[in-house]
Protein backbone atom coordinates (compact mmCIF):
# COMPACT_ATOMS: atom_id res chain seq x y z
CA UNK A 1 0.00 0.00 0.00
CA UNK A 2 2.65 2.56 1.07
CA UNK A 3 6.14 1.91 -0.26
CA UNK A 4 8.77 3.21 2.17
CA UNK A 5 12.33 3.13 0.81
CA UNK A 6 15.05 1.39 2.82
CA UNK A 7 16.71 4.78 3.53
CA UNK A 8 13.43 6.23 4.79
CA UNK A 9 12.80 3.16 6.98
CA UNK A 10 16.27 3.54 8.51
CA UNK A 11 15.56 7.25 9.07
CA UNK A 12 12.25 6.47 10.82
CA UNK A 13 13.94 3.84 13.01
CA UNK A 14 16.59 6.38 14.00
CA UNK A 15 13.99 9.07 14.80
CA UNK A 16 11.84 6.63 16.79
CA UNK A 17 14.81 5.62 18.95
CA UNK A 18 14.62 9.10 20.53
CA UNK A 19 10.86 8.93 21.19
CA UNK A 20 8.95 7.32 24.09
CA UNK A 21 8.61 3.54 23.91
CA UNK A 22 5.89 2.18 21.58
CA UNK A 23 5.74 5.41 19.56
CA UNK A 24 5.13 4.58 15.91
CA UNK A 25 4.54 6.51 12.67
CA UNK A 26 1.25 7.95 11.35
CA UNK A 27 0.68 8.80 7.69
CA UNK A 28 -2.32 11.08 7.22
CA UNK A 29 -4.07 13.10 4.56
CA UNK A 30 -5.97 16.36 5.02
CA UNK A 31 -8.74 17.32 2.56
CA UNK A 32 -8.51 14.04 0.62
CA UNK A 33 -10.12 13.91 -2.79
CA UNK A 34 -9.86 17.67 -3.26
CA UNK A 35 -7.38 19.94 -5.06
CA UNK A 36 -6.22 21.02 -1.57
CA UNK A 37 -5.27 17.51 -0.43
CA UNK A 38 -2.11 17.38 1.67
CA UNK A 39 -0.32 14.34 3.04
CA UNK A 40 1.85 14.21 6.10
CA UNK A 41 3.88 12.01 8.39
CA UNK A 42 3.92 12.33 12.18
CA UNK A 43 4.86 10.41 15.30
CA UNK A 44 2.01 8.26 16.61
CA UNK A 45 2.13 7.68 20.38
CA UNK A 46 0.48 4.48 21.54
CA UNK A 47 -2.48 6.36 23.09
CA UNK A 48 -3.34 7.94 19.70
CA UNK A 49 -3.91 4.66 17.88
CA UNK A 50 -7.59 4.42 16.93
CA UNK A 51 -9.83 1.42 16.22
CA UNK A 52 -10.36 2.92 12.76
CA UNK A 53 -6.62 2.72 12.00
CA UNK A 54 -4.99 0.21 9.71
CA UNK A 55 -1.60 -1.04 10.89
CA UNK A 56 1.15 -1.51 8.29
CA UNK A 57 4.30 -3.35 9.39
CA UNK A 58 7.77 -2.26 8.34
CA UNK A 59 11.26 -3.20 9.49
CA UNK A 60 11.35 -2.13 13.15
CA UNK A 61 8.17 -0.03 13.32
CA UNK A 62 4.51 0.21 12.37
CA UNK A 63 2.73 2.84 10.29
CA UNK A 64 -0.87 3.73 11.15
CA UNK A 65 -3.34 5.10 8.62
CA UNK A 66 -7.03 5.87 9.10
CA UNK A 67 -8.97 3.23 7.14
CA UNK A 68 -11.27 5.89 5.68
CA UNK A 69 -8.36 7.61 3.90
CA UNK A 70 -6.26 4.60 2.91
CA UNK A 71 -7.57 4.58 -0.69
CA UNK A 72 -6.07 8.04 -1.19
CA UNK A 73 -2.65 6.69 -0.20
CA UNK A 74 -2.67 3.85 -2.75
CA UNK A 75 0.76 3.48 -4.42
CA UNK A 76 2.26 6.17 -2.18
CA UNK A 77 6.03 6.36 -1.86
CA UNK A 78 8.00 7.72 1.09
CA UNK A 79 11.69 8.29 0.43
CA UNK A 80 14.65 10.05 2.02
CA UNK A 81 16.21 12.37 -0.54
CA UNK A 82 19.73 13.66 0.11
CA UNK A 83 21.34 16.61 -1.64
CA UNK A 84 24.17 19.09 -0.92
CA UNK A 85 22.06 20.95 1.63
CA UNK A 86 20.92 17.90 3.61
CA UNK A 87 18.28 15.22 3.62
CA UNK A 88 14.51 15.43 3.45
CA UNK A 89 11.62 12.98 3.60
CA UNK A 90 9.34 13.05 0.58
CA UNK A 91 5.86 11.57 0.36
CA UNK A 92 4.30 11.13 -3.07
CA UNK A 93 0.64 10.11 -3.11
CA UNK A 94 -0.69 9.93 -6.68
CA UNK A 95 -4.32 9.35 -5.59
CA UNK A 96 -4.49 12.04 -2.86
CA UNK A 97 -6.61 14.39 -4.97
CA UNK A 98 -8.86 11.77 -6.59
CA UNK A 99 -12.53 12.27 -5.81
CA UNK A 100 -13.75 8.77 -5.00
CA UNK A 101 -17.07 10.18 -3.75
CA UNK A 102 -18.36 10.49 -7.33
CA UNK A 103 -19.65 6.94 -6.96
CA UNK A 104 -23.43 7.06 -6.59
CA UNK A 105 -24.63 6.07 -3.12
CA UNK A 106 -28.06 4.56 -2.80
CA UNK A 107 -29.23 6.10 0.46
CA UNK A 108 -28.97 9.40 2.30
CA UNK A 109 -27.22 7.62 5.17
CA UNK A 110 -24.56 6.24 2.82
CA UNK A 111 -24.02 9.69 1.30
CA UNK A 112 -23.68 11.30 4.74
CA UNK A 113 -21.28 8.58 5.93
CA UNK A 114 -19.17 9.12 2.84
CA UNK A 115 -19.26 12.90 3.39
CA UNK A 116 -18.15 12.54 7.02
CA UNK A 117 -15.30 10.24 6.03
CA UNK A 118 -14.08 12.51 3.23
CA UNK A 119 -14.76 16.01 4.57
CA UNK A 120 -14.91 15.92 8.38
CA UNK A 121 -12.93 12.95 9.70
CA UNK A 122 -9.62 13.88 8.05
CA UNK A 123 -9.70 17.16 10.01
CA UNK A 124 -10.73 15.47 13.25
CA UNK A 125 -8.10 12.75 12.83
CA UNK A 126 -5.37 15.38 13.19
CA UNK A 127 -6.46 15.56 16.83
CA UNK A 128 -6.99 11.81 17.12
CA UNK A 129 -10.76 12.07 16.78
CA UNK A 130 -13.54 11.01 14.47
CA UNK A 131 -17.30 11.24 14.05
CA UNK A 132 -19.72 8.57 12.85
CA UNK A 133 -23.31 8.75 11.70
CA UNK A 134 -25.52 6.53 13.84
CA UNK A 135 -28.86 7.17 12.10
CA UNK A 136 -31.08 9.71 10.38
CA UNK A 137 -34.69 9.67 11.52
CA UNK A 138 -37.81 10.46 9.49
CA UNK A 139 -37.73 14.11 10.72
CA UNK A 140 -34.28 14.70 9.23
CA UNK A 141 -32.44 14.56 12.55
CA UNK A 142 -28.98 13.06 12.14
CA UNK A 143 -27.63 11.33 15.24
CA UNK A 144 -23.84 11.29 15.35
CA UNK A 145 -21.25 9.96 17.75
CA UNK A 146 -17.75 11.28 18.42
CA UNK A 147 -14.81 9.09 19.45
CA UNK A 148 -11.09 9.31 20.14
CA UNK A 149 -9.75 12.80 20.87
CA UNK A 150 -13.22 14.31 20.32
CA UNK A 151 -14.78 12.32 23.18
CA UNK A 152 -14.81 14.58 26.22
CA UNK A 153 -12.99 17.42 24.45
CA UNK A 154 -13.96 20.82 25.88
CA UNK A 155 -14.27 22.16 22.31
CA UNK A 156 -16.83 19.56 21.21
CA UNK A 157 -19.74 22.05 21.24
CA UNK A 158 -17.90 24.26 18.78
CA UNK A 159 -16.84 21.28 16.65
CA UNK A 160 -20.43 20.03 16.55
CA UNK A 161 -22.00 23.38 15.61
CA UNK A 162 -19.29 25.04 13.51
CA UNK A 163 -17.83 22.06 11.71
CA UNK A 164 -20.13 19.05 11.61
CA UNK A 165 -23.64 20.54 11.76
CA UNK A 166 -22.92 23.58 9.57
CA UNK A 167 -21.36 21.45 6.81
CA UNK A 168 -24.03 18.73 6.95
CA UNK A 169 -26.92 21.23 6.83
CA UNK A 170 -25.40 23.10 3.90
CA UNK A 171 -24.62 19.90 1.97
CA UNK A 172 -27.80 17.88 2.59
CA UNK A 173 -31.18 19.64 2.42
CA UNK A 174 -32.85 16.53 3.88
CA UNK A 175 -31.04 17.04 7.21
CA UNK A 176 -32.75 19.53 9.51
CA UNK A 177 -30.75 19.07 12.71
CA UNK A 178 -27.67 17.24 14.00
CA UNK A 179 -27.75 15.60 17.42
CA UNK A 180 -24.67 14.39 19.34
CA UNK A 181 -25.50 11.17 21.17
CA UNK A 182 -21.95 10.63 22.47
CA UNK A 183 -21.56 9.87 26.18
CA UNK A 184 -18.66 12.30 26.64
CA UNK A 185 -16.04 11.36 29.22
CA UNK A 186 -13.09 13.72 29.58
CA UNK A 187 -9.80 11.86 29.91
CA UNK A 188 -6.24 11.60 28.60
CA UNK A 189 -7.67 10.69 25.19
CA UNK A 190 -9.53 14.03 24.97
CA UNK A 191 -7.81 16.62 22.78
CA UNK A 192 -8.62 19.60 25.08
UniProtKB/Swiss-Prot annotation:
A GO MF label: 4 iron, 4 sulfur cluster binding
Cofactor(s) in the UniProt record: [4Fe-4S] cluster
Matches recorded under Gene3D superfamilies: Fe-S cluster assembly (FSCA) (3.30.300.130), HesB-like domain (2.60.300.12)
Complexes and interactors: Homodimer.
Gene from which this protein is expressed: nfuA
Details of cofactor binding: Binds 1 [4Fe-4S] cluster per subunit. The cluster is presumably bound at the interface of two monomers.
Phylogenetic placement of the source organism: Bacteria, Pseudomonadati, Pseudomonadota, Gammaproteobacteria, Enterobacterales
Pfam families the record matches: Fe-S_biosyn, NifU
Gene Ontology biological process terms in this record: iron-sulfur cluster assembly; protein maturation
Function field: Involved in iron-sulfur cluster biogenesis. Binds a 4Fe-4S cluster, can transfer this cluster to apoproteins, and thereby intervenes in the maturation of Fe/S proteins. Could also act as a scaffold/chaperone for damaged Fe/S proteins.
Protein name, per record: Fe/S biogenesis protein NfuA
Organism domain of life: Bacteria
Species, as recorded: Buchnera aphidicola subsp. Acyrthosiphon pisum (strain 5A)
Keywords: 4Fe-4S, Iron, Iron-sulfur, Metal-binding
InterPro entries named in the record: Fe/S_biogenesis_protein_NfuA, FeS_biogenesis, FSCA_dom_sf, HesB-like_dom_sf, NIF_FeS_clus_asmbl_NifU_C
Binding locations of [4Fe-4S] cluster: 150, 153
Family of this protein: Belongs to the NfuA family.
Amino acid sequence: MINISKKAQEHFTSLLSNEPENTQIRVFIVNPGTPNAECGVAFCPENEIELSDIQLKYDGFFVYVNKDTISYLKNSVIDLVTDKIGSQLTLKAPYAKNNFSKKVSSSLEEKVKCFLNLEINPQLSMHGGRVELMKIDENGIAAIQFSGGCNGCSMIGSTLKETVEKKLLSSFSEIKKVYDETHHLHGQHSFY
